[in-house]
Amino acid sequence: LKCHKLVPPFWKTCPEGKNLCYKMYMVSTLTVPVKRGCIDVCPKNSALVKYVCCNTNKCN
């Protein structure tokens, strides 16, 4: 699986076991991702942070 780094078009190949790409947003600025990368389990959203996860190449 290949996931984008914080600034596309840069990307990295995910290590074994991290089979999701994710984007993390602050709820106050939903248009600007704060973090991107590979993750094993999609974290739960909170009052301040929203996560978007997906399992195809460079989908984040």
UniProtKB/Swiss-Prot annotation:
Keywords: Cardiotoxin, Cytolysis, Disulfide bond, Membrane, Secreted, Target cell membrane, Target membrane, Toxin. One of its GO terms (cellular component) is other organism cell membrane. Its main location: secreted. One of its GO terms (molecular function) is toxin activity. Gene3D superfamilies: CD59 (2.10.60.10). One of its GO terms (biological process) is killing of cells of another organism. Transmembrane segments: none annotated. It comes from the Eukaryota. Signal peptide: none annotated. Monomer in solution; Homodimer and oligomer in the presence of negatively charged lipids forming a pore with a size ranging between 20 and 30 Angstroms. Shows cytolytic activity on many different cells by forming pore in lipid membranes. In vivo, increases heart rate or kills the animal by cardiac arrest. In addition, it binds to heparin with high affinity, interacts with Kv channel-interacting protein 1 (KCNIP1) in a calcium-independent manner, and binds to integrin alpha-V/beta-3 (ITGAV/ITGB3) with moderate affinity. This is Cytotoxin 8. The lineage of its organism: Eukaryota, Metazoa, Chordata, Craniata, Vertebrata.
